[in-house]
């Protein structure tokens, strides 16, 4: 489908906000005696976590989880499957889930349930982009980069049909008729 990309959040705005998020996260966890582990939900959050982890000024670990709720189609089945599980044990650690974008929150809510069973000391969420008007479940997001309207976004790791992850900014996809 033909489309164009309109810049919504510039590379400079992303850099400034990621730096601020790093400072907020550092402040929250700097006095904790328990380790902090950042968990990136792949694939979309890989660029965000790469930049964010360098802005957090306390010792931390990083791990990755890949989930799927789409089966073979483009509509979520609601059944969350873990494609790649964590390598690290999160028992008694401060866990910070790092997301690229949160809309309905259904998949994230199920991931939270799975991780809670592993008894972390704390479980928090950081997202680059939040679409609060799309929320279908009640979840508390501790750190939000940008609240955005319900529009299709790409760039900075977020894709459209596996394209546009490389863009250094967040852009809105405008479909042409």
Swiss-Prot record:
Q: Name one GO biological process term.
A: GMP salvage
Q: Which reaction does it catalyse?
A: IMP + diphosphate = hypoxanthine + 5-phospho-alpha-D-ribose 1-diphosphate; GMP + diphosphate = guanine + 5-phospho-alpha-D-ribose 1-diphosphate
This entry's Enzyme Commission designation comes to 2.4.2.8
Oligomer status and interactors = Homotetramer.
Family assignment from sequence similarity: Belongs to the purine/pyrimidine phosphoribosyltransferase family.
What is its biological role? Answer: Purine salvage pathway enzyme which catalyzes the transfer of the ribosyl-5-phosphate group from 5-phospho-alpha-D-ribose 1-diphosphate (PRPP) to the N9 position of hypoxanthine to yield IMP (inosine 5'-monophosphate). To a lesser extent, can also act on guanine leading to GMP, but shows a highly less efficient activity with xanthine.
* The protein, known as: Hypoxanthine phosphoribosyltransferase
User: What species does this protein belong to?
Assistant: Buchnera aphidicola subsp. Schizaphis graminum (strain Sg)
Query: Gene symbol?
Result: hpt
């Amino acid at each position: 489908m033909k489309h164009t990309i309109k810049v919504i959040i510039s590379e400079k705005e992303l850099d400034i906000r990621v730096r601020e998020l790093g400072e907020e996260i550092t402040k929250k966890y700097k006095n904790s005696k328990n380790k902090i582990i950042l968990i990136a939900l792949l694939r979309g959050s890989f660029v965000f976590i790469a930049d964010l982890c360098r802005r957090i000024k306390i010792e931390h670990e990083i791990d990755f989880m890949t989930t799927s709720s789409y089966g073979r189609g483009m509509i979520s089945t609601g059944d969350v499957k873990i494609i790649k599980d964590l390598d690290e044990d999160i028992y008694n650690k401060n866990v910070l889930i790092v997301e690229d974008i949160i809309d309905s929150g259904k998949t994230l809510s199920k991931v939270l349930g799975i991780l809670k069973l592993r008894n972390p000391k704390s479980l928090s969420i950081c997202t680059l982009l939040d679409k609060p008007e799309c929320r279908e479940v009640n979840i508390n997001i501790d750190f939000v980069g940008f609240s955005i309207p319900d529009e299709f976004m790409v760039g900075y790791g977020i894709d459209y049909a596996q394209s546009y992850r490389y863009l250094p900014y967040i852009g809105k996809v405008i479909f042409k008729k």
